[in-house]
Amino acid sequence: MTDLKNGRGKCWKKTAVFVTLLVGVFFSAMQSNGRGDKRNEEAISTGSTGENTVLVGGMPVGIYMETDGILVLDTQEIEGEDGEKYEPARHLVHAGDYIVGINERAVECKKDLTEELADLKQEEVVLKLRRGTEELEVKIDAVKCAGSDHKLGIWIRDNVQGLGTITFLTGNSKFGALGHGIHDADTSVLMDIGGGSLYKTSIRSILKGENGMPGSMEGMIVYNRYNRLGTVEKNTEMGIYGTIEEIDALFEEQIPVQVAEKEEIHTGDAAIRCCLGEEVREYGIQITEVDPNAKEENKGIVLEVTDPELLDETGGIIQGMSGSPILQDGKLIGAVTHVFVNDPTKGYGIFAETMLETVCDGQES
């Protein structure tokens, strides 16, 4: 599970069916940070050195990512300096679009866009948009508002921050984390990222989960170069991936494990590895179902927390645990990704084999 919070733009809306186990809110500056199949249960998304051997994770990290372009959340009505109501972007700009240019100037962030609007000499602007795989241009009449500002009536976002868990590190310093993608909370789209970083974090408090109300962990993240651990390069449905530059700072205890093939995984005893305070520990779970051909790749494992200590402290799986490694028979078999809303002792996981294939995709062998 991931806890996410937007850095700029309007606040995220709560989503109904599932929420990433990435601590559901990303934080800026110094901040704390199902499978819709036969079960029909609500779920929340919870973040190689030869022979598929990796260093096992379980450590929480702060995450900061910038969007590739400026993400459009919605359009809205605005009031002009004449007191009339206007909605200039309605039907022209859609939620989920990315603004990549204005009046032939490339823009990467919210600041670029507001600066261009502040210098506007005429009302008509041409926005260059990316909509899915298509690029298009739309003409919009900006509205002059009180104070001589021009506005387009568009809610936008250009970054996301939060807290999640590292799953593993390969022999060439590539990491896998979360086990699920980071989606925008307002539009539900998988966010296109232009880049990002991982940072040190410390867990400050735990909110215990209850039926119908998933718990969460809160951490302190200081986004500066002294606390930077590495680079985020990919945001996929199977997790986030990139490079760790400060390996010793993150992997204080370096434990090599082999990644299990899907066919090796079975129901029965297993453990998850996570940090609820100052140290990473293993907690007992049961694997109750294994589906190598799951419709959603990040829900191939169904698990139940059985460890009395973990149940007492968290109630089960909580937001912030996305990416927590799942171990069985001495091997890394997967990572926690989602929690059932109506039963926080149960959740989903992704196969570690799938994550390893994703982190290696596009790399030279």
Feature-to-residue mapping (PLM):
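PDZ domains, with a preference for the canonical peptide-binding region formed by the helix
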Residues: 101-134, 343-345, 350-354
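Conserved PDZ fold ligand-binding element
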Residues: 89-110, 326-329, 333-334, 338
